[in-house]
Amino acid sequence: MLTIALPKGSLLRDSIDRFQQIGLDFSAFLEPKNRQLQILDPTHRAKALLVRAWDVPVYVEYGQAQLGIVGYDILREKKPAVAQLADLNFGGCRLSVAVPQASPYRRSVDLPPHGRVASKFVHCALEHFRRLDLPVEIIPLYGSVELGPITGMSEAIVDLVSTGRTLQENGLMEIEVLFDSSARLIAHPLSYRVNGDRLLDWVEKLRSVI
């Protein structure tokens, strides 16, 4: 039976919609009273696991799920040993550097050497500033990253931006985009080879509805 890791949060509804388009129904996850973390498709052809978005590649990498849907941002940060099969063209956003609107900085390279940057994307942020040959201290924050500059703990943040409204409401502005992100279909590399025809059939169906 096919096992799929689905992400909690903003990508879930569109992920379920894509699978519904190819005949697999996991919409029970969207019911307000649902507490199940694992459900069978009514046709009993597939099973879905509901996990934190950051954990999707872990379940796929360790073989507990053959397929998964996860944001490209997470793949860039975690660098898991998974096969990226398709850009699903939803969940669009970007990873950006942002600073207070009143600050003098207009590019990443303008930040002071050894300045502080708050982010949950620690590796992506480090890679970005290393490319610029600018030494900075990355402060790991995993919620309300915007508070870093607001409280004076950091000069900047590296965070996901969708509409930019949250930044604006907190007096911040984007100064540089690191990369664009969207939902990606991933697979366990060995499962993809061993179960080639069967798994490829599901993958091709998903690609057909992008």
Curated annotation (Swiss-Prot):
Question: Which EC numbers characterise this protein's activity in its record?
Answer: 2.4.2.17
Q: Which residues cross the membrane?
A: none
Q: Name one GO molecular function term.
A: ATP binding
Where does it sit, as one GO cellular component term? Answer: cytoplasm
Q: Which UniProt keywords apply?
A: Amino-acid biosynthesis, ATP-binding, Cytoplasm, Glycosyltransferase, Histidine biosynthesis, Nucleotide-binding, Transferase
* Pathway the protein acts in: Amino-acid biosynthesis; L-histidine biosynthesis; L-histidine from 5-phospho-alpha-D-ribose 1-diphosphate: step 1/9
Q: Which reaction does it catalyse?
A: 1-(5-phospho-beta-D-ribosyl)-ATP + diphosphate = 5-phospho-alpha-D-ribose 1-diphosphate + ATP
Say if the entry is tagged with keyword Amino-acid biosynthesis: yes
What is the first-listed, main subcellular location in coarse terms? cytoplasm
Task: Give the GO biological process terms.
Answer: L-histidine biosynthetic process
One Pfam family per UniProt: HisG
Q: Where in the cell is it found?
A: Cytoplasm
- Of which family is this protein a member? Belongs to the ATP phosphoribosyltransferase family. Short subfamily.
Q: What is known of its domains?
A: Lacks the C-terminal regulatory region which is replaced by HisZ.
Q: What does this protein do?
A: Catalyzes the condensation of ATP and 5-phosphoribose 1-diphosphate to form N'-(5'-phosphoribosyl)-ATP (PR-ATP). Has a crucial role in the pathway because the rate of histidine biosynthesis seems to be controlled primarily by regulation of HisG enzymatic activity.
Describe its assembly: Heteromultimer composed of HisG and HisZ subunits.
UniProt protein name: ATP phosphoribosyltransferase
Q: Which organism is it from?
A: Synechocystis sp. (strain ATCC 27184 / PCC 6803 / Kazusa)
